[in-house]
Structures are given as structure tokens and as C-alpha cells.
């Protein structure tokens, strides 16, 4: 006969998100700020600070930004643009920021994609982040037509 866990221990174990490949949190899909904050809280180590910083920068730069978690990643969009302009995802050594219409940004983000319009920015623990450039990309991306899921 299997041993049962006490209810408090079982509830605590169930509440802790699973980390997928590369340390990406497995968070149930959902709309709004709550699932995005759950994702950020579950990001491992230094990546959690990056997630908080990205979220705050996006909220500050794009008033009224729309948020959701889809495919275990936070997505950001603007209602009038009809879709998503940005998402991010944890990998082992970096946090990847995806600009869905990245090839339309002035001064392209460095990461290329197999997808025609997508560009990436990889944020690594020991590399400086150009805050002014990131803010400019977020602002520009939010004004472009959104990517539809």
C-alpha cells in the first residue's frame, strides 16, 4: 500500500512549478498579469531578476500592455495591434527575448531566426544590458501589427 503525504506537504509540492529543459518554468496558460507573475516567480536564480526587470520595463514603456502565458512563456501585446509583439523564455545560459516583428525594428536585435520577421535578444548573466536600446525596441515593437497565435 502506498504511503500518503500529509495534505500540507502534498499541496506545497503541487504548488511548485516544474522546470522544463533549460530551466524554463512550466506554467499553465492564462491571460492577465497573474500567470505572468507566476512564471517570473518560478524562473530560476538570476533569471528571475531578468524576468522582473523585463516585465517592469515593458509595463513602464507600453501603458495598458496585455499579458498572457502561452507555451510556457510570457507574451506581451497591445489590444489595438491585434496580437503579440514580444515574449521571453528561459534557456540554460540565457533568457531569450523574442520580437515577433523584429526585422522591422531600427537597429536589429542580434539574434536571427528561421522565421522571416522574428529577431531575438539573448540576455546572459554576465553581460551588460543596453537598457536604452531594449526600451527603444519594446516601444517600436509595440507599435507594429501584432503576431497572432
Describe every region a protein language model picked out.
Residues 2-149:
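Charge-dense, helix-prone N-terminal extensions
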Amino acid at each position: 500500500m502506498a504511503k500518503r503525504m500529509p495534505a500540507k506537504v502534498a499541496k506545497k509540492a503541487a504548488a511548485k512549478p516544474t522546470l522544463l529543459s533549460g530551466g524554463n518554468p512550466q506554467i499553465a496558460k492564462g491571460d492577465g498579469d497573474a500567470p505572468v507573475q507566476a512564471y517570473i516567480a518560478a524562473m530560476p536564480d538570476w533569471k528571475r531578476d531578468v524576468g522582473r526587470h523585463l516585465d517592469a520595463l515593458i509595463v513602464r514603456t507600453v501603458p495598458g500592455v496585455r499579458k498572457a502565458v502561452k507555451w510556457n512563456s510570457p507574451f506581451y501585446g497591445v489590444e489595438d495591434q491585434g496580437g503579440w509583439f514580444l515574449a521571453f523564455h528561459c534557456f540554460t545560459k540565457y533568457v531569450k527575448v523574442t520580437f515577433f516583428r523584429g526585422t522591422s525594428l531600427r537597429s536589429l536585435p542580434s539574434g536571427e531566426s528561421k522565421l522571416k520577421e522574428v529577431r531575438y535578444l539573448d540576455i546572459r548573466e554576465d553581460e551588460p544590458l543596453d537598457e536604452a536600446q531594449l526600451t527603444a525596441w519594446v516601444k517600436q515593437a509595440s507599435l507594429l501589427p501584432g503576431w497572432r497565435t
